[in-house]
């Protein structure tokens, strides 16, 4: 298993606040329960001018070929607000995003990100402004996310961010909740032997 200590990717700036989950992926595309295939519906109503997805909105930054390989999304406050659909995270990841940087997130969306290993980073508004300034001066600029040291490296700036230690461990070691449980299987079995039988559902 490769340990994920750092990640470097091209940044795409979407300078809009309060982007809700219905904007991230509209409700008509929520008919599947696996995590694959949702990327083509990401920001669907912004990327296309029609319901069939044939008339491309050339003014939307995701359709700018210079950002085709972007994997870090820089945005504003309250990203992922609205309904709790986990499909929003799946769509972002399936499209190719690894990191979302914002000044705040919808609470449920934030936890869904962590559980799916999409890294949500919260920075102050002033720091977000600085990062937007960088992206306006440099097209297809790259940021480095140093998970080990909880730091964003952007040009001449280094910003510290907070992340829950357990979720950070799972992301760095590429473990989901089941994997984490299985790593503690011996401890769980040992504990089960110490408690009364009627506490354990047979």
UniProtKB/Swiss-Prot annotation:
Record keywords: Amino-acid biosynthesis, Branched-chain amino acid biosynthesis, Leucine biosynthesis, Lyase
Disulfide bonds: none
NCBIfam families: leuD, PRK01641.1
Protein's name according to its UniProt entry: 3-isopropylmalate dehydratase small subunit
Pathway in which the depicted protein is active: Amino-acid biosynthesis; L-leucine biosynthesis; L-leucine from 3-methyl-2-oxobutanoate: step 2/4
Family from the record: Belongs to the LeuD family. LeuD type 1 subfamily.
One Gene Ontology cellular component annotation held by this UniProt entry: 3-isopropylmalate dehydratase complex
Subunit structure and binding partners: Heterodimer of LeuC and LeuD.
Known catalytic reactions: (2R,3S)-3-isopropylmalate = (2S)-2-isopropylmalate
InterPro entries, per the entry: 3-IsopropMal_deHydase_ssu, Aconitase/3IPM_dehydase_swvl, AconitaseA/IPMdHydase_ssu_swvl, IPMI_Swivel, LeuD
GO molecular function terms noted in the UniProt entry: 3-isopropylmalate dehydratase activity
Reported function: Catalyzes the isomerization between 2-isopropylmalate and 3-isopropylmalate, via the formation of 2-isopropylmaleate.
